Amino acid sequence: MPDPARLADAAREGLAFVSAQPGVIEAEVFVADNRSLLTRLNYTSHIPCNGVEEPKSTETYGLGIQASFESSDGPLLGFGSEPSDLSPAGVARALDKARRGAVRDPEFRSLPRPGAARRVLVDYHDPALLAIDDAQLVECGWKVLQGGLNGFLTASRLGELAGSDEALRTLGLILGGDVTIVQESIAIASTAMPEPQTDVTTLIMSFVTGMVESRDAKGSGWSTGTRLADLTDEAGADAARRAVEAVGGERVPTGDYTVIFGRQPITDLMNNLVVPSCQAGSFYASSTPFLGKLGKRVASPRLSIYDEGAMPGLMGSKGITCEGLPTGRTNLIKDGVLVGTLASWYEAQRLLHDPGLKEKLGVDASEAAPALVARSGFRTGSGGRAFDTQPETSASNIVIAGSDPVSLDELIRSVRDGLYVGRIWYTYPINGLRAGDFTCTVVGDSFIIRDGRIVAPLKANTVRINDNITRVLEHVVGVTKDTKGTLVWAAEEVVYTPEIAVTGVHVDAIAGFMEALA
């Protein structure tokens, strides 16, 4: 189990050692102890399997030092780290690496400084997740897997396809995925904030894909939480149900459709397009489609997006950033208007002192300052808050809210004719992020809407969406009432989002040649 007091002592002693060395102007010592536990799900009805496999864990701990050094050319900035050694010898080696790698950075102003904001989230981790043992980890896997198996067994559609209970396994029923638990413990101390601060975080998540292989049908399910008690069999049950619903998928022609985006597609669009576009570094590099638009409308007036970094119970919440600054709420888009950015201390200071600030944000420094508060400096990597990297800008909990929300059934009725897109893959900007153009493939959990109701599943991997994210944001026509925490592959943030309807989404039919091969 992580020991925050030990980490705090290492940060305090490390800072004292570094500060006493010749040529050091200011320094920051970051200490981390991370554990990631995983159990893999692997059920195949037609191939012998274990159901739950590979319970395993990884652990990383160490310290990183960021320091500025005196030189005849001005301050030099360096970073060094040392794994698995929090002793004075480890501190000395990390400092030596920082000194030897130090370079002149004319845009560096200072290491983070405290402001008026104070920490609001403390003692929010789950002791049960910190103390979980191997048997409990395996039991978590079985809980999620059992939800999927029950979903398959109670699906009348599968009984009709198989003809008998004994023949069910010949349909090729598959459940794959994992349950992952992350335990994070950090301490940080710096010249500007010499008293060590600690933060302990726990989270648990599950991802499941269900398949009816003989019918080329698949579905997905997931869950997010911060406590062991949050884990249910929901992810497995959802994956099985959606796989069954996907049987008999149909194609649609190329065209512009009103699309209801499910939570996973919205999360993927946020992760790959909207969140990067709202980062201070993107404005500095003039690589955002929102360039020069702070205070201007960039989305439908019914849409608001913010990063909620300190809300209890949300999976991405932290007490402090990896720069030792308080987390909190950062409004990005409010009622369709761009009002803020995600920023680390370095990126905020760099942009505030940029001669081209007004061109890049659209306002002068006094108006820009409230939109450049450093609440998003995190050291993400290796399954936790990494000691061996410098802070970068990262969101925590992206929350999407819409005015006049309705039920999903009501939203489907209002669409009349269109598509429900429940899962996309390979989402990326084309022509550069600034252009806003993007493409993605619809890979499952999707349906055709006619006359205000769902009439058939959309066949997976038969359409691509090619559109522009600024156009999508501006053409939101409805949102649902319920939000759910959602993760996508390689994302650092969790997105809490409803389902969202957008008009005029361009869809291209693909892979038509596959029909001739069937």
Q: Model-derived features: where do they sit?
A:
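Dual-mode signal for accessory low-complexity, basic/Gly-rich regions
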Residues: 291-518
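Active-site bordering "gate/hinge" segments
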Residues: 1-329, 334-337, 497-518
